[in-house]
Amino acid sequence: MNKKFTDEQQQQLIGHLTKKGFYRGANIKITIFLCGGDVANHQSWRHQLSQFLAKFSDVDIFYPEDLFDDLLAGQGQHSLLSLENILAEAVDVIILFPESPGSFTELGAFSNNENLRRKLICIQDAKFKSKRSFINYGPVRLLRKFNSKSVLRCSSNELKEMCDSSIDVARKLRLYKKLMASIKKVRKENKVSKDIGNILYAERFLLPCIYLLDSVNYRTLCELAFKAIKQDDVLSKIIVRSVVSRLINERKILQMTDGYQVTALGASYVRSVFDRKTLDRLRLEIMNFENRRKSTFNYDKIPYAHP
């Protein structure tokens, strides 16, 4: 998008898109950061649980390779520790299966970070319960010291039985009950803000921006994010990069030569979860500005409206 919007115009747009009531989707989804073996390997415990959790309409699953890679690629002045703390503030629960070299590293790092440790649930193969190992004497012991429900043990058969079951059948199983009790405890003791300042929810601001500002470029999105999310410039760019990557993977937006555009799927989603009347009035006012080169949006023409 080559059009130039003044700071005042950007602030007016931000005011509308962040106004209480503009977003009308569900706020109750549980966000789970799922770590473990290769999710593409159908035998990995992480893959099995991801398939089971996908049966729940109130659960969003995020993977370190999707989120952390985007964060680390642009971390610049931000240390890994600060990015881990951002993650700790963003997700409800971290579930980790120590089943691969990468997940061993994550377990060690997360268990030693106080903010992450409070949200971590480690699910360990029961056959390693009594094994004399660094994992048992280090991270696992540390987790159990702070929260006895943070380490669950089960057999591969127990996990498979739960993951292959319907939700109604799974509710009767011991592993399901233990897992839900652990998740409930973590969420009760660690409240998460789910506004656009949360990296996992920043798309609630950026997606309608892309919807309204046809072919908006990366630079403009970063400027808007910096002013709306109120993080520093580097972190704002990291958040935009992460959100844009996720939206492209979800096929809600496309990256064109001149900027980003919503797909039909993305447009349908935007109109289903945001206030349609406000969207339509904003779009009309933006078109008028582009045609007439008005100095500001006419804020009075776009009152907050209920559909």
UniProtKB/Swiss-Prot annotation:
Keywords: Antiviral defense
Translocase listed as a keyword: no
GO biological process, alphabetically ordered: defense response to virus
Signal in keyword set: no
InterPro entries the record matches: STM3845-like (IPR049725)
NCBIfam families in alphabetical order: STM3845_fam (NF038232)
Job of this protein: Possible ribosyltransferase/DNA-binding component of antiviral defense system retron Ec86, composed of a non-coding RNA (ncRNA), a ribosyltransferase/DNA-binding protein and a reverse transcriptase (RT). Expression of the 3-gene retron confers protection against bacteriophages T5. At multiplicity of infection (MOI) of 0.02 cultures grow normally when infected with T5 without collapsing, at MOI 2 cultures enter growth stasis.
Protein name in the entry: Retron Ec86 putative ribosyltransferase/DNA-binding protein
Native organism: Escherichia coli
